[in-house]
Design a protein with these regions (language model features):
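Gly/Ser-rich "nucleophile elbow"/oxyanion-hole loop immediately N-terminal to the catalytic nucleophile
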Residues: 260-275, 295
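Short beta-strand/loop motif that positions the catalytic acidic residue
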Residues: 366-368
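Conserved small/polar residues in nucleotide/adenosyl-binding loops
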Residues: 372
Length: 373
């Protein structure tokens, strides 16, 4: 909409933004006419996606709390909701240009004597705050992580994490050492403020089997502890390339076995434990469940897998759609794989758990998103 309650113009310099939008629309009409098209209609997919994007933008503002015509409060009985686009004129222009650059994404084009063209899809797939962060990272012109070397990438991640907000408080935080597959491993423990004993979650951090440690997912572990009322034990497993496959996988299993055997000492409830992990950590958590099944324990009652790496096949559509423009690129993922294991190992279920037997495993909750390879 060029102007009116559904456009960005009402929250900007209206005259200028309307003029810019009119110019854009005129250019599109001329280009489509030259191609023989006389009608342009948004697809249902695009409309639904745009409505979600507008709602996501509104949740990041105070407009949703305002008692004004912006929310429909000017007419008694009128449905309430944030009417203007609150994402800003800059992002709006960028989205318009992206629609054109991707072949009129989200629109059905028709005209006499020409074949119908429909490039269906969501115009905006990312949450607005995620889109903003990615834009800020792009403006920093940082070198690709895969060009930094393993230690350089670790140092970069450590510095990068210093700027993140602190995690929320929990009842108690502690550190210690546990027995891994080939020696001691560090862990960080998060205990709820409520009286125990509590169930235990064994957590494995992300980082492509190369980056991160038991401290790197601290805000998430704190939040998980608060939300679940469970003890979270974040494990510092061994990393590639110093320790290639199967070091991380075997450490994950050994750590889970040790934690289950020492539940009392950790203030936990004896019995089954849960496993959780993000990205490469989700890979280790899934592998741990298969190893526990095949090796006679420990008993695992559930698995929380967040964007887990489950297979080593690189011809999936996600590797095409999300090859660039995100923090985890196709090139970075290839780098992680090459450091972690040889091509000959990549069909091993301890590398690609999706290739293993899936019967007899604990129930899994898998959280994923559209923008990962």
């Amino acid at each position: 909409m060029i102007t009116g309650p559904g456009s960005p113009s009402v929250l900007s310099n209206m005259a200028v933004s309307i003029e810019q939008h009119v110019d854009w629309v005129v250019e599109r009409i001329a280009a489509l006419r030259d191609a023989g098209f006389t009608t342009m209609e948004a697809t249902d997919t695009a409309q639904a996606g745009w409505e979600r994007h507008m709602a996501d933008c509104a949740t990041l503002t105070l407009h949703r709390l305002a008692n004004t015509w912006y929310t429909g409060a000017n007419v008694p009985g009128k449905p309430q909701g944030v009417m203007p686009y609150t994402g800003g004129v800059g992002p709006y222009r960028s989205i318009c240009n992206e629609v054109v650059g991707r072949g009129m994404l989200g629109f059905r084009l028709t005209g006499p004597g020409v074949a119908e063209q429909c490039n269906d899809g969501e115009v905006v797939r990312l949450q607005p705050d995620v889109r903003l962060v990615l834009g800020m990272l792009a403006e920093m012109n940082l070198p690709p992580i895969e060009t930094m070397g393993a230690q350089g990438a670790r140092d970069f991640l450590t510095e990068f994490n210093k700027g993140r907000p602190a995690g929320r408080p929990v009842g108690e935080v502690g550190t210690g050492m546990l027995q891994g597959a080939d020696g001691p491993l560090p862990y960080k423990l998060y205990r709820p403020a409520t009286a125990g004993p509590h169930p235990i979650v064994v957590y494995f951090h992300g980082g492509g089997w190369v980056l991160g440690d038991e401290l790197s997912d601290d805000p998430f572990c704190r939040d998980l502890c608060r939300r679940t009322g469970m003890i979270i034990v974040s494990v510092g497993y061994r990393h590639a390339p110093e320790h290639r496959f199967p070091a991380a996988a075997e450490d994950g299993y050994a750590a889970t076995r040790w934690i289950a055997a020492h539940a009392d000492e950790l203030g936990g409830r004896p019995g089954p434990v849960l496993v959780a992990g993000w990205s490469a950590g989700g890979n280790i958590a899934a592998v741990t469940c298969q190893l526990a099944r095949d090796r006679g324990g420990p008993e695992i009652s559930g698995q929380l897998l967040i964007c887990p790496v489950t297979d080593s096949t690189f011809d999936r559509q996600s590797y095409v759609d999300n090859a660039a423009g995100y923090f985890l690129t196709r090139g970075l993922m290839f780098w992680f794989w090459d450091l972690y294991c040889s091509p000959a190992d990549r069909t091993d279920p301890r590398v690609a758990p999706l290739r293993g037997k899936l019967e007899g495993l604990p129930p899994a909750f898998i959280a994923d998103r559209k923008s990962v390879v």
